[in-house]
Amino acid sequence: MARVPLTFSDVAIDFSQEEWEYLNSDQRDLYRDVMLENYTNLVSLDFNFTTESNKLSSEKRNYEVNAYHQETWKRNKTFNLMRFIFRTDPQYTIEFGRQQRPKVGCFSQMIFKKHKSLPLHKRNNTREKSYECKEYKKGFRKYLHLTEHLRDHTGVIPYECNECGKAFVVFQHFIRHRKIHTDLKPYECNGCEKAFRFYSQLIQHQIIHTGMKPYECKQCGKAFRRHSHLTEHQKIHVGLKPFECKECGETFRLYRHMCLHQKIHHGVKPYKCKECGKAFGHRSSLYQHKKIHSGEKPYKCEQCEKAFVRSYLLVEHQRSHTGEKPHECMECGKAFGKGSSLLKHKRIHSSEKLYDCKDCGKAFCRGSQLTQHQRIHTGEKPHECKECGKTFKLHSYLIQHQIIHTDLKPYECKQCGKAFSRVGDLKTHQSIHAGEKPYECKECGKTFRLNSQLIYHQTIHTGLKPYVCKECKKAFRSISGLSQHKRIHTGEKPYECKECDKAFNRSDRLTQHETIHTGVKPQKCKECGKAFSHCYQLSQHQRFHHGERLLM
C-alpha cells in the first residue's frame, strides 16, 4: 500500500490573530488540552512515525519554527496554533502504511516527553472511565469531559460569542457556533439543493431522501433513522426517568430535557423573536415560532392536503384519518390519538386541580385552562380573523372559524358522503347513523347523542339562563343562542348563499334556503310520503292533513 505522508500541520487547526484574541487564559489552556487530545487520538490509530535525519540543531530548529510563523503571519495573518502552543519538532511525520510500529513502549513518549500529558494519553487509549461525577455517578474517560459535565451543575458557561452574546460550556460548540454568523453553508444536498454549515448535518439530512430507518425497536417495531433516537425511544418502554429536577421533583428520560426544563424555574428566555419581541427558553421554540410570521407549513397531509408547522402535528393529524389511538390510560383503558390528550385525561383520576379562579372559585387542572376560563369574565377575545374581523377567546376557535372562508371540508362520512370541515362534526354526524344516544337526562329519561345536548336540555328543568345580552338584557340557555341573538343588533349575516348572494345570520337558515336552488326535500312525511324542504313545512302538513290520525 502506498504511503501518504501526513505532516503535523495537516492535523493542526489554524486561527487568525483576531480569533485568538477572543480567548482568555483559561480558554487558551483548554484549547491546548483539546488539541493535545485530538493529537493523541491520531497517535492511538494505526499510524507509523518516522523521523528525518536530525540535521538541525535544537537552536536552529527553533529559529526555523519561529521564522515559519513570522512568514505565515505576514502572508495571511494566520498561524498554526497547534505548533505554536506545543513547540513540536517539524521533523516528525506520520505515514499511512503497514509498517511495523517502532520498538518502543509508547511512541507518545517522544511527543509528550516535554509535557505531563503522557499518563493522560495512556489512560485515553483504554476504555477505563477514571473520572466520575459524584452527583450523578456518571463516569468519563477524560478529565476534560468531566470538567465540561460539571459546568452543567455549577452553571458556569465560559465561552461567550461577541456577536450575539450566546455562551457555551464546551469550546468546540463555541467554535461551531461562530460559523452561524458567517452564513457560510458549503455542504449542499444533491437531492434537494438544501445547504448545511456542517458535513454531519448533510449526512443526517440525506437519510431523509433514502427513507432508510435502520434502527428498529424490538418491543414495538418502530424504526428510527438514528441510533440515538432509538435509545431515547426505548426508555419509554422501561419507564426509566433517571434525571430529577431538584426544584420541583419532575423526572426526565434525558439529561438535556431536564436542563431545558430547569430554565422554567430560572425564568431564562434568551431567544427573542425580532418580528414581535416574544422570548423563548429554547432555540427550537423560537425556530418554530418564526414559521407563524413566515407562514411556512412544510408538513402536508397527503389525504386532505392540510399543512402543519411541525412534523408531530402532522403525525397526530393523520391519526384522525386512520383512527389510531396509541396512547392508552392504564386506569380506565380509554385511548387517545395524542399524548397530550392522555396527560390531560389522567388528571381526572388524580382529581388534582391546582388553579382556582378568583372571580367564581372554579378550579382547573392546568394554568392554560384557567387563563381561557378567565376570558369569560373579562370578555377578552385576543384572536382575530383577518378575513372578517371576528374575534375569539381561543386560538383553536379561530382556526376552526377560518375553515369557513376556505370552504374546505376534508372529513367525509363513508356512509352517506356528507363532508365536514372539522373531525368533531364528522363524529357527531356519524352517531346519527349508529343511532347511539348514550347521554340520558336523570330528570325525564330523555336521551341525547351529545353531552352538550344533554347539558343544554337540562337547563329546561333548572330554568337557568346564564347568558345575558348586554344590549336588551334578554337571557339565553346557551352561549351559541346568545351569539346568534347578537347578530340581530349588529346586523351581521355571515352565511351567504353562493347562488343568489342572499345572506343569513344562522347557518341552519342558509342550509334551508339552499334547498330552493338544489330542489332537495329532505323532510319526508311517514304517513303519505310527501317531501318538504323545511322541517316546519312538514310539521304544518302533519297537523292539517294527518291531525286526526296523530291524535288517535
UniProtKB/Swiss-Prot annotation:
Compartment(s) where it occurs, according to its Swiss-Prot or TrEMBL record: Nucleus
PROSITE patterns attached to this UniProt entry: KRAB, ZINC_FINGER_C2H2_1, ZINC_FINGER_C2H2_2
GO CC entries: nucleus
Entry-linked InterPro entries: KRAB, KRAB_dom_sf, Zinc_finger, Znf_C2H2_sf, Znf_C2H2_type
GO terms of molecular function: DNA-binding transcription factor activity, RNA polymerase II-specific; RNA polymerase II transcription regulatory region sequence-specific DNA binding; zinc ion binding
Disulfide bonds: none
Any Pfam family matching the protein: zf-C2H2_6
UniProt KW Hydrolase keyword: no
UniProt main location, coarse: nucleus
Superkingdom of this protein's organism: Eukaryota
Entry keyword set: DNA-binding, Metal-binding, Nucleus, Repeat, Transcription, Transcription regulation, Zinc, Zinc-finger
Zinc-finger ranges (C2H2-type): 131-153, 159-181, 187-209, 215-237, 243-265, 271-293, 299-321, 327-349, 355-377, 383-405, 411-433, 439-461, 467-489, 495-517, 523-545
Biological process, per Gene Ontology: regulation of transcription by RNA polymerase II
Segments forming domain KRAB: 6-78
Function: May be involved in transcriptional regulation.
Family per similarity comment: Belongs to the krueppel C2H2-type zinc-finger protein family.
Record-linked PANTHER family: PR DOMAIN ZINC FINGER PROTEIN, ZINC FINGER PROTEIN 154-LIKE
Protein name, UniProt field: Zinc finger protein 404
Originating species: Homo sapiens
